[in-house]
């Protein structure tokens, strides 16, 4: 064979890029014999008698007329014939194109009226018995051409070596290998069609004119695969089907392909007719009557209702082809079927069905139009299938899932106050199957598009429009209880109840649970859909104290009471450790201290919405009054009677009950860890005194009994104030109110964990130190601005640290009750009375750690504080 290729090379090749080989003009005897033997061997394989080469001089098949027109030279093989338009391969190879491949097979072909083996070229034609016997004719000199072609078999570009005349078309091949493979495929297909009993599909004259069959004797019975139409000499044919017609497949691969084809056809038949356009010609002849349409990009623009209303008669569908059909393939490609399945689960997009037109259509009705019958070969009673991400699902089950989804989260549908037709089931944007997939909006009223429907789920709303209480209720249901509003760092004050603020109200705004907001897992869409899910933003919240019924929100134990620092200050909801307010001096010190310690030192939440301030103030005052009304425990050293200086806050001063202290203790604990080291510094001593003030002892050192460790009166007061949140006003109030008598011993005056230990006479100082650690935490929160605001608040407090109130034991407790958030507002921090302090000490981390806890606790505490401070930095 290689010699033939060499012989066939034209002399022009010498000038071409490839080296030329000598060209022989005649086929030698050896080649003729080889061709004859090979041909006969092949014929024997397929059960034909052998053919003698001599018989091919002027072959006239007895079954065909001899006149030039009707005598079809079926396929004439020429080497290097002149280029002719070649038939695309798919029209020949695809099983669906059997009829098209042969439709023009023999029309008008025939090289000339004279026999093909004319003596002009002095060669004898060789019969190749594959399709019909083609005639091999050596290339004439004028026929020789060096033409670049794309091989009809391997689809590679190369020099044309062989061409096969297929009726009006000529197939060109780059090598003998491709040529032989193509001939073999055609021969098998022709033979299969002849023996398969498909003749009834084609008129008899069709055979006579187009595919003259070889008049050879068929020696054996052959089975033909019903899918690939190939003849396989195998006993392992797979039978499929039941009833009258049984199909035979040569392999499991063919069987599976057949099943997939049936499935695709079923899916198409169940699609609304309008969604699939007949871009592609009907599949063979048998698909013509089914009216099956394929999905195309243009079908997105068809209103779903129009598609359902149209009865797709074959005539209408045939004339409907929408848009250009670039692909000429007649098979159903998986992508087409995928598109078909997509239409069953469209996601809501701007354009949707006119709601007013389809009040009675269920949201996901994809029942096949009555006029579309299942394609041939499909069992008539099999339920239609819907493609989903999990594979084909029977349509009834799919519909049931959709209905369940619609029923399950009823609140998602919400009041369709923006929809034109409230009764329409299409107002639920979360359900699939409601609107057609994306496309240009049609001339529908704006009310029908999901964009204008109420956004019924917080996921769909852009988080840039947080719902404040004034917004219309239907727009955005409040987010789930665990998730804060999208853009608010803390719940707005207006949403907080004015009273004692029980936790349930704060934490539960009557919000629906999160579960129904999450789309059900059965929602399967073949393409990604972006569903914004609320991401919880961490908000520091003090550890809820079991003993207190007060809000475990971000508020410290003192959080119940908000004391407005300045009109602009917002309530300090989250500041636990810093319950004291600072006098102006203290504010300065506090600011410096705060600079020392990172603002995040304590667990307080510094970022509160400014709006809550006013609310917080009123709430705080009420709470403080409530707490302050009961007289302090006997150990307190006096009831909570403040001189007129602190009247408003006085009334509001909260009893420092054990519960409060427990909260403070937790809060302080966090803060203290960060600041324990600071105590050693001189400022630390001040802080301790401040802490003492909190306890009610700090001011005594300042005013009454300056402990050695406690700064002088003003200094001590200042220190105390500083330790507090760093808000001077609050601290000033605290100083005024808190006049811890030096005689008052702190509940456990035991030396504070800090290295500086206070003598029993300095119990105030020691307590101050312990408190101070707590205060340090609060100081961490203080910012420069906070100090300024504190000064303003101090003015509000209208008292000096030196005020007689400082000397009042009851006041001393309350002085610490005022807690300041850095910028938000003053929170009254309940200071336990001296007697209570002992009980409180365990509650307040600073006090238990410093006063109650032995010194041995100090090193671990300090280490812990250092670690926390570093982390905060």
From Swiss-Prot:
Residue window of motif SUMO interaction motif 2 (SIM): 653-657
Crosslink Glycyl lysine isopeptide (Lys-Gly) (interchain with G-Cter in SUMO2) sits at which residues?
A: 677
What GO molecular functions are on record for this protein? SUMO polymer binding; zinc ion binding
**Phosphoserine modified-residue sites:** 629, 699
Which segments show compositional bias classed as Polar residues? 318-339
Q: Report one GO cellular component.
A: nucleus
Record key words, sorted: Intellectual disability, Isopeptide bond, Metal-binding, Phosphoprotein, Repeat, Ubl conjugation, Zinc, Zinc-finger
User: Low complexity bias located where?
Assistant: 417-433
> Spans of biased composition, class Basic and acidic residues?
1-14, 614-625
Q: Name one GO biological process term.
A: inner ear morphogenesis
Residue interval(s) of motif SUMO interaction motif 1 (SIM): 620-624
Q: Where is the composition biased (Pro residues)?
A: 460-484, 739-754
**FCS-type ZnF:** 142-180, 216-256
Q: Tell me, how does this one assemble?
A: Interacts (via SIM domains) with SUMO1 and SUMO2.
Q: Which family does it belong to?
A: Belongs to the SOBP family.
The protein's role, per its UniProt record:
Implicated in development of the cochlea.
Recorded disease: Impaired intellectual development, anterior maxillary protrusion, and strabismus: A syndrome characterized by severe intellectual disability, strabismus and dysmorphic features such as anterior maxillary protrusion with vertical maxillary excess, open bite and prominent crowded teeth. Some patients may lack dysmorphic features and manifest temporal lobe epilepsy and psychosis. Esotropia and amblyopia are present in some individuals.
Any idea what this protein is called? Sine oculis-binding protein homolog
């Amino acid at each position: 064979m290689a010699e033939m290729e060499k012989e066939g090379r034209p002399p022009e090749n010498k000038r071409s890029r490839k080296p030329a080989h000598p060209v022989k003009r005649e086929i030698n005897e050896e080649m003729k014999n080889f061709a004859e033997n090979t041909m006969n061997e092949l014929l024997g394989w397929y059960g034909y008698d052998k053919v003698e080469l001599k018989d091919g001089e002027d072959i006239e098949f007895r079954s065909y007329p001899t006149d030039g027109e009707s005598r079809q030279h079926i396929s004439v093989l020429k080497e290097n014939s002149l280029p002719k338009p070649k038939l695309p391969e798919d029209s020949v190879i695809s099983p669906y194109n059997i009829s098209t491949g042969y439709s023009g097979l023999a029309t008008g072909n025939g090289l000339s009226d004279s026999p093909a083996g004319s003596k002009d070229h002095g060669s004898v034609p060789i019969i190749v018995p594959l399709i019909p016997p083609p005639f091999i004719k050596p290339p004439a000199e004028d026929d020789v051409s060096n033409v670049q072609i794309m091989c009809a078999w391997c689809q590679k570009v190369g020099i044309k070596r062989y061409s096969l005349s297929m009726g009006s078309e000529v197939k060109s091949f780059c090598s003998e290998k491709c040529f032989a493979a193509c001939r073999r495929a055609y021969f098998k297909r022709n033979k299969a069609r002849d023996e398969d009993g498909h003749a009834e599909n084609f008129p008899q004259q069709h055979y006579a004119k187009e595919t003259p069959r070889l008049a050879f004797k068929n020696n054996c019975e052959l089975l033909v695969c019903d899918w690939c139409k190939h003849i396989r000499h195998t006993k392992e044919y797979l039978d499929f089907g039941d009833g009258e017609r049984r199909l035979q497949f040569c392999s499991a691969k063919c069987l599976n392909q057949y099943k997939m084809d049936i499935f695709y056809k079923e899916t198409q038949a169940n699609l609304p007719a309008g969604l699939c356009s007949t871009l592609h010609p009907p599949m063979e002849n048998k698909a013509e009557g089914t009216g099956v349409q394929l999905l195309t990009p243009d079908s997105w623009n068809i209103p779903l209702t129009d598609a359902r209303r149209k009865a797709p008669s074959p005539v209408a569908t045939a004339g409907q082809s929408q848009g250009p059909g670039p692909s000429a393939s007649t098979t159903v490609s998986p992508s087409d079927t995928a598109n078909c399945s997509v239409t069953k689960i469209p996601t809501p997009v701007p354009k949707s069905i006119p709601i007013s037109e389809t009040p009675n259509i269920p949201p996901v009705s994809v029942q096949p139009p009555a006029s579309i019958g299942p394609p041939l070969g499909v069992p008539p009673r099999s339920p239609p299938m819907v493609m989903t991400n999990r594979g084909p699902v029977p349509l009834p089950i799919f519909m049931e899932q959709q209905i369940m989804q619609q029923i399950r989260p009823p609140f998602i549908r919400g009041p369709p106050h923006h929809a034109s037709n409230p009764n329409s089931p299409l107002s639920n944007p979360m359900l699939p199957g409601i609107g057609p997939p994306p496309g240009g909006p049609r001339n529908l009223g704006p009310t029908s598009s999901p964009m204008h429907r109420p956004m019924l789920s917080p996921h769909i709303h852009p988080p840039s429009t947080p719902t404040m209480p004034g917004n219309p209720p239907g727009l955005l249901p409040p987010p789930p209880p665990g998730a804060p509003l999208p853009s608010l760092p803390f719940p707005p004050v207006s949403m907080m109840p004015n009273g004692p603020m029980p936790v349930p109200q704060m934490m539960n705004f009557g919000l629906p649970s999160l579960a129904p907001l999450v789309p059900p897992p059965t929602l399967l869409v073949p393409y990604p859909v972006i569903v914004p899910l609320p991401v919880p933003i961490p908000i520091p919240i003090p550890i809820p104290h079991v003993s207190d019924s007060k809000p475990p929100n971000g508020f410290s134990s003192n959080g119940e009471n908000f004391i407005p620092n300045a009109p602009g200050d917002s309530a300090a909801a989250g500041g636990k450790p810093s319950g004291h307010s600072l006098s102006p001096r203290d504010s300065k010190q506090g600011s410096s201290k705060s600079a020392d310690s990172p603002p995040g030192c304590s667990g307080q939440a510094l970022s509160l919405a400014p709006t809550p301030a006013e609310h917080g103030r009123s709430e705080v005052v009420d709470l403080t009054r409530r707490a302050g009304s009961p007289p302090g425990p006997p150990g307190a050293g006096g009831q909570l009677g403040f001189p007129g200086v602190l009247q408003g806050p006085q009334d509001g001063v909260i009893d420092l009950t054990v519960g409060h202290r427990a909260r403070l203790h937790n809060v302080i604990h966090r803060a203290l860890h960060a600041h324990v080291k600071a105590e050693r510094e001189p400022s630390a001593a001040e802080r301790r005194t401040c802490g003492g003030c909190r306890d009610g002892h700090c001011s005594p050192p300042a005013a009454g009994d300056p402990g050695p460790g406690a700064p002088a009166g003003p200094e001590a007061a200042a220190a105390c104030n500083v330790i507090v949140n760093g808000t001077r006003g609050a601290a000033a109030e605290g100083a005024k109110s808190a006049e811890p008598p030096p005689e008052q011993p702190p509940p456990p005056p035991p030396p504070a964990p800090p290295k500086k230990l206070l003598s029993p006479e300095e119990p105030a100082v020691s307590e101050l130190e312990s408190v101070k650690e707590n205060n340090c935490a609060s100081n961490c929160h203080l910012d420069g601005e906070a100090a300024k605001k504190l000064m303003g608040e101090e003015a509000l407090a209208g008292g000096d640290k030196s005020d007689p109130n400082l000397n009042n034991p009851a006041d001393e407790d309350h002085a610490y009750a005022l807690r300041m958030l850095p910028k938000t507002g003053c929170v009254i921090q309940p200071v336990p009375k001296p007697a209570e302090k002992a009980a409180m000490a365990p509650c307040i981390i600073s006090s238990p750690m410093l006063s109650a806890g032995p010194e041995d606790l100090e090193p671990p505490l300090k280490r812990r504080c250092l670690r926390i401070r570093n982390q905060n930095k």
